[in-house]
């Protein structure tokens, strides 16, 4: 097979190895679950290749099939997330590294970012709580910040309101990468109360970022336990 065939099916290249994804994401994991995902691998080198992910965190396991790929061959790595081993609610991030050849070192070229989002467990809430839940409302879920020079920063404010019937708790607030910073005035909102969420984009960190900068919020609103705010911002050449 001509290696060029894989540019469409496996668009991401790490050395002579091509992959179908550049990051490993487990979007909505519930405690106790063991979700899996597959990373498709193509060997465009002229040597036999053994797909290995290095530096796996304790909550991930990986199995490659077949264990060895001949030249021009494809296979897959099945990755399993053990949610019981995640350290906390909300977002956990790490980096794993694809071994390109035996004895390969870890570095930026073969880094694959990992993210897992563990949702709160609502199975134990009472009937009373179920009938009178908090309800989060945001003034915006997507921010347009345009272009930023490397020495610039820009901030936007979102109003967070509890339009529900019991206290709203922001259990976790995190950014997916270093291009953003967040500040939240209040973590607990009584029914009818609101607060300000300030999101700042930093031009100097934008160049290093893969994907869309995002903010993650985990709440005790059973209908909106996870909220992702996307920030459209690019680095000015």
Can you say where each PLM-predicted feature lies in the sequence?
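Surface-exposed binding patches on compact interaction domains or structured appendages
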Residues: 45-74, 165-194
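Short glycine/proline/serine/threonine-rich loop/turn segments at secondary-structure transition edges
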Residues: 85-93, 205-212
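Beta-strand-rich interaction surfaces with strong enrichment in secreted/lumenal proteins
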Residues: 27, 64-69, 83-84, 146, ...
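Beta-strand-rich extracellular modules
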Residues: 99-103, 202, 218-222
């Amino acid at each position: 097979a001509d290696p060029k065939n894989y540019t469409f099916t496996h668009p991401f290249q790490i050395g002579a190895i091509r992959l179908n994804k550049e990051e490993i994401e487990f979007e909505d994991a519930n405690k106790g679950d063991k979700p899996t995902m597959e990373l498709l691998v193509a060997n465009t080198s002229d040597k036999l290749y053994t797909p290995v992910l290095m530096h796996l965190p304790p909550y991930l396991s990986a199995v490659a099939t077949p264990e060895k790929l001949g030249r021009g061959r494809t296979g897959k790595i099945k990755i399993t997330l053990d949610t019981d081993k995640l350290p906390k609610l909300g977002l956990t991030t790490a980096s794993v590294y694809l071994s390109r050849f035996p004895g390969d070192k870890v570095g930026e070229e073969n880094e694959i970012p990992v993210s897992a989002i563990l949702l709160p467990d609502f199975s134990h809430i009472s009937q009373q709580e179920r009938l009178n839940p908090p309800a989060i409302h945001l003034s915006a879920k997507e921010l347009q910040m345009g272009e930023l020079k490397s020495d610039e920063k820009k901030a936007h404010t979102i109003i967070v309101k509890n339009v529900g019937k019991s206290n709203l708790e922001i259990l976790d607030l995190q950014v997916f990468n270093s291009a953003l910073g967040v500040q939240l005035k209040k973590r607990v909102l009584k029914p009818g109360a609101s607060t300000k969420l300030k999101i700042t984009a930093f031009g100097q960190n934008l160049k290093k970022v893969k994907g869309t900068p995002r903010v993650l919020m985990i709440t005790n609103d059973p209908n909106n336990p996870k909220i992702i705010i996307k920030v459209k911002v690019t680095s000015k050449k």
